[in-house]
């Protein structure tokens, strides 16, 4: 066995790997001790020897002068001259012992002016610790302890924010310098890099769009009670160390160390020992109290080292808890925004997407009502709470923006193509909703996500894709009763923040899956249950991502600026505008737990164009290869009017620009007056609109087919 093998065997025997870092710290400390001792020991011994010899010489000379003064007859008879000679001797003694400056500092004006006190406070939270001035009273030392413990973390956070701002400014200056350099050189390489960055930017925008989400594969990860991803379960089980226990451990260690200091230092009291220990572990080190027992300095150093580790642990736990609290508040606010967005865009899942005009029209109507809401009188403490909530919200949003900027910078150095998106499905998020002949199990929140994602395709100025949606959500929030709790005020300030739109553009929204089931009445409805307890299905199911089911639809009624049709999305003034194609294919399933059958694709029959009263007849339907009995019954019930007089262009409905508002006296009706105060306008304030074409909702024929089926049976 070689020498290296023996050393390696011995290290494994004593388990050196578990505490080698501590040994390295001790070795580094010993190296520093040797280094400083080498250069300071001899010089300090010489300086102390000179000081001792000088002190002995001064003492001997002072004694000789006193003897001369006592023997001198002139000085014996003249008391004033004798006093003056004695004062000169004392001054000479103080100058020789270098005590004049120290006496002058103690006898001058107090250093505890406003500027001096601010200088001392700055020494504490910056951990500089010049040692002048220092506190001498017990009250001042107690204030020093708490001020330093609270000020040091705050100052570190301030330095972090300032460093991030300076780093961003330096980065912008560097980009500008590189840009100017590229413009001056105008080389092909710089042009290629510029085009590459632009293409990458356009690629990211395409990914966030509706078409990009269709093209990217989406892998569905299943979650259920007691069954989830192992990494997520491990992350959930990792609980941080309790902060109260850490603080109790720190307090116990401070008391124990202070007691040991009182034993080793006879002149110290317990309060002074606590003050010295806390000032030491906070790395301030004012130097107003020193050890008088050099033999115990090593043990004192070990006590301070353990206390410093405990204090650092407490600071880290508190910082992590604050960061998690900020992240939790941000996630809850984003979730509320998504829920409110779902309420804004709630509609029938079988009806086509609303055009961008509906998104831009509705917020203005709601803003008119919101501006007439009377302001609530709030007191000083309520206003202070609003101000505090606003500051906390600004800090949360600013931190998220900085994190997103860092992530965007790091993404440029990673691979160019991103990994597939991962969507999560939970059992509690799925609901069942029916519409006529079809039944679908869909995720309720997926509509809000899909509608928010569709805003990127709306005809709104770039950089303000969420502006109209936020205006509508703000109007909804204003009508809610105001609460005085901090969370409600923070959410209100969250909506009012000007950077919220940018946050929504940069936040990766959670995508949930939609499971579509087509009911086939030709056979029995079979309900199967998975042996492992998964969800039952009806008919033939195919799992697909919510984002992947979105199809571009530019066919809508000609009344594009109608308030009723596009604000509420529930009235249709034209025949149903589904894509006029024979059939289309849903893409292949992505290994979802809901895809139980062996079919790779599912054929969806053609959507029929159903005539409405006052509308021209739709084009004749094409022959269907896959027609269910329900579709056949619907075709038999449809009777198209061939009268050429009604084959006219649909009459254009009144829009917001055609309405003339006028104020109508309401009399003494308090309800109408309150309604006008809240809404701004009432139906009585408008002229009677011209008669338009009658409207009706589409009857899917489901009840009729069920009645006919029961009759035939």
From Swiss-Prot:
InterPro entries: 2pore_dom_K_chnl, K_chnl_dom. SUPFAM superfamilies: Voltage-gated potassium channels (SSF81324). GO terms for cellular component: plasma membrane. The keyword Ubl conjugation does not apply. It is a multi-pass membrane protein. Its main location: membrane. The chain crosses the membrane at residues 16-36, 142-162, 243-263, 298-318. Glycans are attached at residues 53, 77, 98. Belongs to the two pore domain potassium channel (TC 1.A.1.8) family. This is TWiK family of potassium channels protein 12. It comes from Caenorhabditis elegans.
């Amino acid at each position: 066995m070689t020498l290296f093998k023996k050393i390696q065997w011995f290290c494994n025997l004593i388990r050196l790997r578990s505490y080698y870092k501590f040994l390295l710290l001790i070795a580094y400390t010993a190296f520093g001790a040797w280094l400083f001792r080498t250069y300071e020991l001899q010089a300090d011994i010489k300086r102390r020897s000179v000081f001792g010899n000088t002190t002995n010489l001064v003492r001997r000379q002072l004694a000789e002068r006193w003897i001369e003064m006592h023997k001198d007859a002139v000085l014996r008879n003249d008391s004033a001259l004798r006093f003056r000679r004695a004062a000169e001797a004392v001054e000479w003694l103080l100058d020789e012992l270098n005590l004049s400056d120290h006496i002058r500092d103690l006898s001058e004006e107090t250093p505890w002016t406003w500027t001096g006190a601010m200088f001392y406070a700055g020494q504490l939270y910056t951990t500089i610790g010049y040692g002048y001035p220092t506190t001498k009273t017990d009250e001042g030392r107690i204030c020093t302890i708490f001020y330093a413990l609270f000020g040091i973390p705050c100052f570190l956070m301030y330095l972090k924010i300032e460093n991030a701002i300076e780093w961003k400014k330096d980065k912008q200056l560097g980009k500008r310098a590189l840009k100017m350099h590229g413009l001056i050189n105008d080389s092909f390489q710089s042009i290629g890099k510029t085009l590459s960055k632009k293409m990458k930017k356009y690629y990211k925008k395409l990914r966030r769009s509706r078409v990009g989400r269709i093209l990217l594969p989406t892998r569905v990860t299943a979650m259920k009670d007691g069954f989830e991803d192992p990494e997520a379960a491990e992350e959930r089980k990792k609980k941080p160390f309790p902060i109260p226990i850490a603080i109790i451990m720190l307090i116990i260690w401070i008391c124990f160390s202070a007691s040991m200091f009182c034993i080793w230092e006879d002149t110290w009291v317990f309060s002074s020992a606590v003050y010295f220990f806390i000032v030491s572990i906070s790395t301030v080190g004012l130097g107003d109290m020193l050890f008088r027992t050099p033999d115990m300095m090593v043990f004192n150093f070990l006590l301070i080292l353990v206390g410093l580790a405990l204090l650092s642990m407490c600071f880290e736990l508190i910082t992590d808890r604050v960061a998690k609290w900020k992240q939790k508040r941000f996630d809850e606010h984003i979730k509320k925004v998504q829920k409110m967005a779902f309420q804004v865009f709630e509609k029938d899942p079988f009806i086509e997407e609303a055009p961008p005009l509906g998104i831009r029209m509705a917020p203005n109507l709601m803003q008119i009502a919101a501006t007439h809401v009377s302001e609530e009188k709030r007191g000083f403490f309520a206003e202070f709470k609003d101000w505090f909530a606003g500051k906390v919200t600004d800090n949360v949003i600013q931190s998220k923006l900085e994190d997103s900027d860092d992530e965007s910078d790091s993404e440029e150095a990673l691979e160019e193509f991103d990994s597939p998106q991962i969507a999560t499905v939970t059992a509690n998020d799925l609901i069942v909703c029916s519409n006529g002949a079809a039944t679908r199990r869909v995720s309720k929140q997926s509509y809000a996500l899909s509608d928010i994602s569709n805003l990127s395709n709306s005809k709104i100025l770039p950089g303000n894709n969420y502006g109209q949606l936020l205006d509508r959500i703000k109007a909804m929030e204003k009508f809610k009763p105001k609460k005085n709790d901090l969370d409600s005020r923070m959410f209100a300030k969250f909506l009012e923040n000007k950077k919220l739109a940018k946050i929504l553009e940069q936040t990766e929204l959670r995508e949930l899956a939609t499971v579509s089931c087509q009911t086939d009445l030709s056979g029995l409805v079979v309900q199967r249950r998975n042996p492992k307890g998964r969800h039952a299905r009806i008919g033939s199911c195919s799992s697909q991502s919510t984002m992947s089911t979105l199809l571009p639809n530019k066919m809508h009624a000609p009344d594009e600026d109608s308030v009723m049709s596009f604000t509420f999305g529930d009235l249709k003034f034209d025949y149903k505008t589904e894509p006029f194609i024979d059939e289309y294919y849903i893409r292949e399933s992505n290994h979802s737990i809901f895809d139980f059958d062996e079919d790779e694709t599912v054929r969806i029959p053609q959507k029929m164009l159903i005539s409405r009263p006052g509308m021209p007849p739709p084009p004749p339907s094409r022959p269907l290869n896959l027609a269910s009995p329900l579709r056949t019954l619907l075709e038999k019930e449809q009777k198209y009017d061939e009268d050429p007089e009604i084959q006219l262009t649909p009459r254009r409905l009144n829009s917001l620009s055609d309405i003339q508002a006028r104020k109508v006296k309401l009399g003494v009706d308090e309800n109408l007056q309150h309604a006008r105060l809240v809404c701004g306008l009432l139906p009585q304030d408008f002229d009677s609109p011209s008669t338009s074409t009658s409207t009706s909702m589409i009857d899917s024929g489901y009840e009729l087919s069920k009645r006919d089926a029961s009759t035939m049976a």
